[in-house]
């Protein structure tokens, strides 16, 4: 028997997924159902693009609902208090700089479900986060990049 996959995430990330799920169920699902009923009233379904479009959207929304339910049911909430205050871990925000003299960058380390690099959130599965997790402020870390080379970064700060 296979184990269910768990999804590491912050409580905030789980709450965002829950809100998305509630919106899909309460708003989008009924709206699509109405559109399907209206499109059916147009007659012949074989050449009814409105009907086909609504059915395609319904399939997408139903799939997303199932995915969200699975992720929420199997969420592993990250406890950033379980590690030392100055240690990089899931749920913490880390500031680092590429050596020798790049500008500091700050990212929150989150589960892959929440990752959004443009919003300053990187996945714990990314090469950068993977190299930083478990390290402490002041340490220099070699981060292997996908192209085979590595860069050295210095951890400047860690916060919750």
From Swiss-Prot:
Keywords for the protein's UniProt record, in alphabetical order: Coiled coil, DNA-binding, Transcription, Transcription regulation
Family label: Belongs to the GreA/GreB family.
GO molecular function: DNA binding; RNA polymerase binding
Encoding gene (name): greA
One Pfam family named in its UniProt record: GreA_GreB_N
Job description of the protein: Necessary for efficient RNA polymerase transcription elongation past template-encoded arresting sites. The arresting sites in DNA have the property of trapping a certain fraction of elongating RNA polymerases that pass through, resulting in locked ternary complexes. Cleavage of the nascent transcript by cleavage factors such as GreA or GreB allows the resumption of elongation from the new 3'terminus. GreA releases sequences of 2 to 3 nucleotides.
Origin species: Leuconostoc mesenteroides subsp. mesenteroides (strain ATCC 8293 / DSM 20343 / BCRC 11652 / CCM 1803 / JCM 6124 / NCDO 523 / NBRC 100496 / NCIMB 8023 / NCTC 12954 / NRRL B-1118 / 37Y)
Any single GO BP term: DNA-templated transcription elongation
Coiled coil residues, start to end: 49-77
PROSITE patterns noted in UniProt: GREAB_1, GREAB_2
Protein name: Transcription elongation factor GreA
NCBIfam families reported in the protein's UniProt record: greA, PRK00226.1-2, PRK00226.1-4
SUPFAM superfamilies: FKBP-like (SSF54534), GreA transcript cleavage protein, N-terminal domain (SSF46557)
Cited HAMAP family: GreA_GreB
InterPro entries assigned: GreA/GreB_C_sf, TF_GreA/GreB_CS, Tscrpt_elong_fac_GreA, Tscrpt_elong_fac_GreA/B, Tscrpt_elong_fac_GreA/B_C, Tscrpt_elong_fac_GreA/B_fam, Tscrpt_elong_fac_GreA/B_N, Tscrpt_elong_fac_GreA/B_N_sf
């Amino acid at each position: 028997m296979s184990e269910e996959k768990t999804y590491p995430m912050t409580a905030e990330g789980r709450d965002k997924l829950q809100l998305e799920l509630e919106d899909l169920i309460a708003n989008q699902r009924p709206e699509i159902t109405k559109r399907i009923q209206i499109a059916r009233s147009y007659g012949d379904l074989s050449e009814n693009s409105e009907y086909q479009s609504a059915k395609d959207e319904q399939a997408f929304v139903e799939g997303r609902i199932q995915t969200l339910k699975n992720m929420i049911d199997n969420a592993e909430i990250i406890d950033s208090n379980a590690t030392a205050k100055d240690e990089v871990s899931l749920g913490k925000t880390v500031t680092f700089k590429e050596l020798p003299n790049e500008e500091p960058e700050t990212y929150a380390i989150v589960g892959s479900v929440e990752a959004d690099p443009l919003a300053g959130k990187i996945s714990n599965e990314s090469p950068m986060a993977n190299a930083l997790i478990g390290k402490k402020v002041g340490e220099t870390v070699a981060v292997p990049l996908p192209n085979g080379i590595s860069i050295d970064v210095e951890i400047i700060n860690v916060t919750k």
